[in-house]
Amino acid sequence: CFVRNCPTG
C-alpha cells in the first residue's frame, strides 16, 4: 500500500 492508501493497514 502507500502512505495513506491502505484499507486495513
From Swiss-Prot:
Instruction: State if Disulfide bond is listed as a keyword.
Output: yes
The main place the protein resides is secreted
Q: Cellular component GO terms, alphabetically?
A: extracellular region
InterPro entries, per the entry: Neurohypophysial_hormone_CS (IPR022423)
Residue pairs linked by disulfide bridges in the UniProt entry: C1-C6
Keywords, in A-Z order:
Amidation, Disulfide bond, Hormone, Secreted
Where it sits in the cell: the answer is: Secreted
Positions carrying Glycine amide: G9
Say which domain of life the source belongs to.
Eukaryota
Extract the GO molecular function terms from the UniProt entry.
neurohypophyseal hormone activity
Q: What does this protein do?
A: Potentiates spontaneous contractions of the gut and also pulsatory contractions and bladder-shaking movement of the nephridia. May be involved in osmoregulation of the animal through nephridial function.
Which family is annotated? Belongs to the vasopressin/oxytocin family.
Record's protein name: Annetocin
Which organism is this protein's natural source? Eisenia fetida (Red wiggler worm)
In the record, what lineage is assigned to the organism producing the protein? Eukaryota, Metazoa, Spiralia, Lophotrochozoa, Annelida
